[in-house]
């Protein structure tokens, strides 16, 4: 993240300070999700998580270094909630039968590409600067659109919540 902030004109110290907000933003978002959205369907949390990064990225591209911290707060919040949604949304969509095996099939590719993403994105940032954010904006918006097409069966009375 600091390299991205340098690309939009942030001073080195400001870039590092903004990037340091990532962890606190993730934790704060998880606490808010647990307290404010605990009775909501995980699909709502997934949609909110998917829009957070694109919103922050557009603001960063439009306004530059002064909103680097806001970008990190939104990006971190979305990332933090996504870690919860990765477990709760498949359970809500598919139910508890075969949950472990299904999660393994879902999580394996995610972990693989998640491990590659920082290095690959670093290469893209080196080549395109802050404009590399358009790639992440597009990917997150594609995920958001997919979530709007996701059909969830109503929960049965005996289904765990």
Say what each PLM segment does.
Residues 81-94:
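Intracellular juxtamembrane helix-capping segments at the cytosolic ends
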Residues 132-149:
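Symmetry-related core transmembrane helices of the 12-TM Major Facilitator Superfamily/SLC fold
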Residues 10-24, 101-105:
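Loop-to-transmembrane helix entry
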Residues 1-13:
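Short amphipathic helix-loop junctions that connect adjacent transmembrane helices
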Residues 62-71:
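Helix-loop junctions at membrane interfaces in 12-TM secondary transporters
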Residues 29-42, 125-126:
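Helix-to-loop junctions at the C-terminal end of transmembrane segments
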Residues 44-59:
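Structural signature of the two symmetry-related core transmembrane helices
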Residues 96-128:
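A late C-terminal transmembrane helix in Major Facilitator Superfamily
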């Amino acid at each position: 993240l600091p390299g991205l902030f340098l690309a939009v004109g942030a001073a080195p110290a400001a870039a590092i300070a903004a990037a340091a907000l990532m962890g606190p933003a993730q934790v704060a978002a998880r606490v808010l999700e647990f307290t404010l959205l605990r009775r909501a369907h995980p699909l709502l949390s997934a949609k909110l998580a998917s829009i957070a990064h694109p919103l922050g990225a557009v603001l960063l591209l439009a306004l530059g270094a002064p909103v680097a911290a806001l970008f990190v707060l939104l990006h971190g919040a979305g990332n933090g909630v996504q870690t919860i949604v990765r477990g709760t949304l498949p359970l809500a969509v598919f139910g508890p039968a075969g949950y472990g095996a299904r999660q393994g099939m879902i999580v394996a590719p995610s972990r693989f590409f998640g491990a590659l993403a920082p290095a690959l994105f670093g290469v893209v940032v080196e080549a395109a600067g802050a404009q590399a954010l358009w790639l992440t904006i597009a990917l997150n918006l594609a995920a958001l659109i997919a979530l709007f097409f996701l059909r969830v069966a109503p929960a049965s009375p005996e289904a765990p919540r």
